[in-house]
Regions:
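Bacterial N-terminal signal peptides that target proteins for export
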Residues: 1-6
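Hydrolase catalytic cores
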Residues: 92-95, 114-119, 144-145, 224-296, ...
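Acidic, Ser/Thr/Pro-rich low-complexity intrinsically disordered segments
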Residues: 155, 292, 341-432, 436-440
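Subtilisin-like peptidase catalytic core
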Residues: 50, 57, 70, 74-155, ...
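Bacterial N-terminal signal peptides
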Residues: 7-14
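Substrate-binding/access-modulating region of protease and related hydrolase catalytic domains
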Residues: 48, 115-195, 205-208, 214, ...
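N-terminal domain-start motif of subtilase-like serine proteases
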Residues: 22-52, 74-86, 298
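C-terminal subdomain of the subtilisin-like protease fold in secreted/lumenal serine endopeptidases
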Residues: 21-24, 39, 65, 134, ...
C-alpha cells in the first residue's frame, strides 16, 4: 500500500578546508541563525566532494537557487506542482543553496548535490516503493550522504534491507526523527533503524522543539524551527518561505556529514557516524538524552576530532546480514576457520546505531570454542548454533540454538555465530572479542 511519508510542520509563509571564517554573499545569510549554531560560520566550506543525495519530493530546477547551481545532478525528472511538492526544494536549499548572491546560503553551499524525486503522484506523494528505487540508484555510486526527510510509523522490511545495502556499499543515511513529539512520539521509520543517523529539531535556544519526536534511537539534533528556505514560486511568489520541522534539521546534519567527509575522505560511513556523535555539542541533560541524542551537530568539532576506531564488518546486526545468500549474496567471511580457530578482534557498539554485532565462526572438529567480550562490563558475547536464523528467535528455537559461551564442534566441525551485545543500560561499548579453540 502506498503511504504518505512526508514530514513537515508549516509555521508561516514569508513574502579541513582551512580555518578561515566563512563569508556569505547572500542577503539573508545573516538571518540564517542555524549556521552559527552548527559552526558553519566559523570555518570555510570545501569545494564539492562527497555528494549530498536528497531523496524527497522534487527539487525545482528552475528556481533561482538551483537553475545555474554548479555540481548539481537531477537523478530523475523533477515535479514540483503537487500540494506537498515544495518540500524537496526547501530541504535541498537548507543543505546546499549556493553562495550566489540571490538570497540564502545552504550549510554547505559548494556541495556536490544529487536530488531524486521520490513522489509518485501529487496525491500519493512519497512511498516506500519510490524510496527503494531512489536508494537503489544512489547506492551504485557510494560514498554519498543520503538525506531522508520523511518517515512513518509502519516499518517496511524491504526499505530497511535496501538501506542496509546502501550502508554496506559505503553510504551514510541521515533521516528526520519525525514531528509527533506532541502526540506521544511514536517510533518513526526509517529514523529509528540501526545505521540510520536520526535527527531531532532544536530552536534558537538549543532546546528540543515540542513537535520533535523523541526516543532512545535518536542520534543527533540540529536547528529545525523557523527556517528560511527556497520553495517553488507557486507556493510563495518570492520563492521563499519560513517553515519548521525535523525535515529541515536532517539536511543540516547531512550537509555537515558531507562537508566533514569531503575534508576527511578516509573515514568509513561507520566512522563518520560515530565521529558526528562523539563531536556533537551537548545540550540538555549531560550526555545522551532522548530529545537531542548526543547533542547538536558541530562542524568545526567534527573536523578536528580524533578518528574513531573502524568497525569494518558493518552491517552485522543479525545472522541474516552475515550468512551468505540471505540479505547479501556473499554475506561475511567467517572470522575463524580450521587453520586459524582462535582470534581476537576489536569493535564497537552503540545503543541507537549499532546495538549488536554478529560474526560467523568455524568450530573445529573435536574441539570446544569459548567466546568472551572484554569491555569493562558493557558488552557480552554468546554463541548461536548453525541452525539459528536470527538472534531474536522465539524461546523454542533459542533452546535449540543458543549455546552460551561454549560450543563443541562434534566429529566434523560446525559453523556457528557469535553475538556481541550491550549489557544493562550501556549506551556504547568498545570491546575486544576473543574466540578460543581448545580440546576441553
Amino acid at each position: 500500500m502506498a503511504r504518505r511519508l512526508l514530514l513537515v510542520l508549516v509555521v508561516a509563509l514569508a513574502t579541513a578546508a582551512g580555518a578561515q571564517a566563512r563569508v556569505d554573499a547572500d542577503p539573508l545569510a545573516p538571518q540564517e541563525w542555524w549556521l552559527s549554531h552548527v559552526g558553519a560560520d566559523r570555518v570555510a566550506a570545501p569545494g564539492p566532494g562527497v555528494p549530498i543525495a536528497i531523496v524527497d519530493s522534487g527539487t525545482d530546477p528552475t528556481h533561482e537557487e538551483f537553475a545555474t547551481r554548479p555540481s548539481t545532478t537531477f537523478l530523475n525528472d523533477q515535479t514540483t506542482f503537487g500540494r506537498d511538492e515544495w518540500h524537496g526544494t526547501f530541504v535541498a536549499s537548507i543543505a546546499a543553496a549556493p553562495d550566489n548572491g540571490v538570497l540564502i546560503d545552504g550549510v554547505y553551499p559548494q556541495a556536490a548535490l544529487q536530488v531524486f524525486d521520490a513522489s509518485t503522484t501529487p496525491i500519493t506523494g512519497i512511498t516506500d516503493f519510490t524510496v527503494v528505487a531512489a536508494i537503489t540508484a544512489i547506492t551504485q555510486h557510494c560514498p554519498a550522504v543520503i538525506n531522508l526527510s520523511f518517515g512513518g510509523t509502519d516499518p517496511d522490511p524491504n526499505l530497511q534491507d535496501v538501506l542496509l545495502g546502501a550502508m554496506r556499499s559505503g553510504c551514510l543515511i541521515v533521516a528526520a526523527a519525525g514531528n509527533n513529539g506532541d502526540e506521544g512520539s511514536p517510533v518513526s521509520y526509517p529514523a529509528s533503524w540501526p545505521h540510520v543517523v536520526a535527527v531531532g529539531a532544536t530552536d534558537q535556544n538549543d532546546v528540543s522543539v515540542s513537535f520533535s519526536t523523541v526516543g532512545p534511537w535518536l542520534d543527533l539534533a540540529a536547528p529545525g524551527k523557523d527556517m528560511i528556505g527556497a520553495v517553488p514560486h507557486w507556493r510563495n511568489a518570492n520563492g521563499y518561505s519560513v517553515e519548521s520541522g525535523t525535515s529541515f534539521a536532517a539536511p543540516i546534519v547531512a550537509a555537515a556529514a558531507a562537508w566533514v567527509w569531503t575534508v576527511r575522505p578516509t573515514l568509513t560511513a561507520s566512522q563518520l557516524s560515530a565521529l558526528l556523535r562523539a563531536s556533537a555539542r551537548d545540550v540538555g541533560p549531560a550526555g545522551f538524552d532522548n530529545a537531542t541524542g548526543w547533542g547538536i551537530v558541530d562542524i568545526p568539532a567534527a573536523l578536528a576530532a580524533p578518528t574513531p576506531p573502524n568497525d569494518p564488518s558493518e552491517p552485522n546486526d543479525d545472522i541474516s546480514q552475515v550468512k551468505p545468500g540471505v540479505l547479501f549474496a556473499d554475506g561475511q567471511a567467517p572470522v575463524t576457520r580450521a587453520a586459524k580457530p582462535s582470534i581476537r578482534l576489536a569493535a564497537t557498539l552503540e545503543a541507537s546505531d549499532d546495538p549488536r554485532d554478529v560474526y560467523r565462526i568455524w568450530v573445529p572438529a573435536k574441539r570446544y570454542v569459548r567466546v568472551s567480550a572484554v569491555s569493562g562490563g558493557n558488552a557480552a558475547a554468546r554463541i548461536w548454533g548453525p541452525k539459528a536464523v536470527g538472534v531474536r528467535e522465539g524461546l523454542a528455537a533459542q533452546r535449540r540454538d543458543l549455546r552460551g559461551q561454549r560450543m563443541y564442534g562434534g566429529p566434523h566441525g560446525s559453523a556457528a555465530y557469535v553475538e556481541v551485545l550491550l549489557t544493562g543500560r550501556s549506551q556504547n561499548a568498545r570491546y575486544t572479542l576473543s574466540v578460543t579453540a581448545a580440546r576441553k
